[in-house]
Amino acid sequence: MGSEKQYIDLYGSGRDALFSHSAAALNAVRDKAFDDFRRLGFPTRKVEKYKYTDMDAIFSPDYGLNLNRLDIPVNPYDVFRCDVPNLSTSLYFVVNDAFYSRLMPKSTLPEGVYVGSLNAYAAENPGFIADYYARIARTDTDAVTALNTMLAQDGLLVHVPRNVKVERAIQVINILRADVDLMVNRRVLIVLDEGAEARLLFCDHTADERRFLATQVTEVYVGANASLELYCMEETHHLNSRVSNVYIEQQADSRVSHNVITLHNGVTRNSLELALCGKGAECDVNGFVIADKEQHVDNNTLIDNRVSHCTSHELYKYVLDGRSVGAFAGKVLVREGAQKTVSDEVNRNLCATKEARMYTQPMLEIYADDVKCSHGSTVGQLNDAALFYMRQRGIPVKEARLLLEFAFINEVVDKITLEPLRDRLHYLVEKRFRGELCKCQGCSMCK
């Protein structure tokens, strides 16, 4: 047993605090999650799904935890002013793992829509939470999900009722703030009922240059004929470690666009498991990574086609500089009976230095015969001929490299349907390539 022991001991000593500061609906699954974690232990690199990231190195440091819910002084507006020009949003804050209710905006949301504390809602609506919480995020198959479930005390809940369309995008700023090294276990639950529509933008930032470990488990339920656009952007400092597991379940004729953007980080491992459970469901899964120095970014995806007539498109791109490490493992599973499945999966990667490393593993697993599925990946460097051509026309080599990298990543940026966000990301990507965001200096949306 490695780093698991400290968390097993922690649960034993902190169980009373966890239960006393959490709603009964969250506590109901806590002990089972602990039993599952103790049985599973952290996966090693011998486990295929985790072969590119050393989980023991992430979890072995001795982090503090705020189990007694001590107040952490912060005014989010003094730290970040996350403005995307021409994009009108309903703005919310999560500080570490707790929803920040002191700065609730004046409600511009349609009647019946809830955006707020998961723990507070669970205390008032235990039946609703019991229907969704820890259902698709199974603790018996993933140690990180089990660990998060046994330690999580709050987070965010978004619920959009049947046939309600939320016109204004919902923006959530996740802030890591502490005076000591801290572990944060955040939970997110998103439920869109039948025919509902919403757009969510999550921005992850660090307010202090402390060593943080953030685990986040997100469960997303998208009802029949519902539509969700989900954007997750990370810009944290180099001392930050982030392990995120996202689980999405789609019903018939639903549409999901899931976009992961890593502009700056320390060590990041993102996992996405998306299940197409109803006929006619469609998903568009995109991501891009810009990494340098010794940053590490690992994206692992599973698109599970459980029924017939579903469609999925997946595109991830990486630009790696310095001694950074990137990894992508994407699997498309087509189950028996899932005929007429259409799926394509593409991973393109650019290593700007000889020291940068990229590991890629796209996979298809098909048990139906009437399908259209493809997958592919490439790893390469900047085109020497293109560089030579541009230099012959008077473009300095540094500028030429920037233009080629910018053109490479823009294919993913252009898939973002929120036009103001897309325009802002074009600007941020250019700044990142110019080295202007070499460490987290606050919210880049305002710079």
Which residues fall in each region the model found?
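N-terminal amphipathic, basic helical "cap/leader" segment at the start of enzyme domains
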Residues: 1-146, 315, 321
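Conserved beta-strand/loop scaffold segments within soluble protein domains that form the structured core
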Residues: 106, 111-114, 121-395, 409, ...
